């Protein structure tokens, strides 16, 4: 939510979300609240792409290999107006700024295992604004209000529900990305 807010998304924008894991899907939901003209999600996992098509049919999807050309062809200014990088790989960090149009905003949501470098000579002339959009609790009440009002529906993301006594198995399921898991809800009444 924080990342979508600081990205200054307008209704005329083409927004690219790179990565459709659990955090990427939550980012997508928050971007959708801003009602941009066009949303593109870059993802390589076919299950995640099918999930997006099933639940968010107005969202365009593309593979990383085709992303740059696809975004250029499906935007009004030769690239995305806003890019949210949620995947967290060196290649996706590079893809983020490559897919951004000149004067775009690139918001980094991902947490990287290694420091990323900005190849300034290659970026020269793009005049990009980089922002970081990690977790910030200042919007928690607003997020809860949006969920309560039905404006932010996270229920499709909950693919598994487990009793509290099975929390270790649930964590293992989530960590190893088995059985199409996106999010696991823990039911404390089923102790």
Language model regions located:
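Mid-domain Rossmann-like dinucleotide-binding core that forms the NAD(H)/NADP(H) cofactor-binding site
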Residues: 1-65
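Glycine-rich cofactor phosphate-binding loops and adjacent beta1-alpha1 units
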Residues: 7-9, 49-50, 54-129
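Structured loop/turn residues at beta-strand edges in well-structured enzyme cores
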Residues: 10, 34, 78, 152, ...
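Structural detector of well-ordered beta-strand residues that form the stable sheet scaffold
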Residues: 16, 40, 105-107, 131, ...
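Conserved acidic E/D residue at the C-terminus of a beta-strand in Rossmann-like folds
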Residues: 43, 110, 134
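C-terminal hydrophobic helical "lid"/dimerization subdomain
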Residues: 94, 98, 137-191
């Amino acid at each position: 939510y924080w990342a979508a807010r600081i990205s200054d998304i307008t209704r005329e924008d083409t927004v690219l979300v790179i990565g459709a894991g659990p955090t990427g899907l939550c980012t997508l939901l928050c971007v959708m609240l801003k009602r941009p003209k066009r949303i593109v999600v870059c993802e390589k996992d076919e299950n995640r792409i099918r999930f997006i098509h099933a639940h968010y049919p107005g969202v365009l999807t593309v593979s990383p290999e085709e992303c740059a050309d696809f975004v250029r062809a499906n935007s009004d200014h030769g690239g995305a107006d806003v890019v949210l990088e949620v995947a967290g790989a060196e290649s996706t960090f590079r893809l983020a700024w490559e897919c951004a149009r000149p004067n775009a905003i690139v918001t980094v949501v991902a947490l990287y295992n290694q420091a990323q470098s900005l190849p300034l000579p290659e970026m020269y002339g793009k005049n990009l604004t980089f922002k970081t959009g990690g977790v910030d609790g200042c919007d928690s009440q607003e997020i809860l209000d949006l969920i309560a009002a039905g404006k932010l529906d996270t229920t499709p993301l909950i693919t598994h529900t487990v009793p509290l006594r099975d929390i270790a198995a649930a964590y293992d399921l989530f960590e190893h990305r088995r059985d199409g898991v996106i999010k696991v809800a823990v039911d404390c009444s089923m102790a």
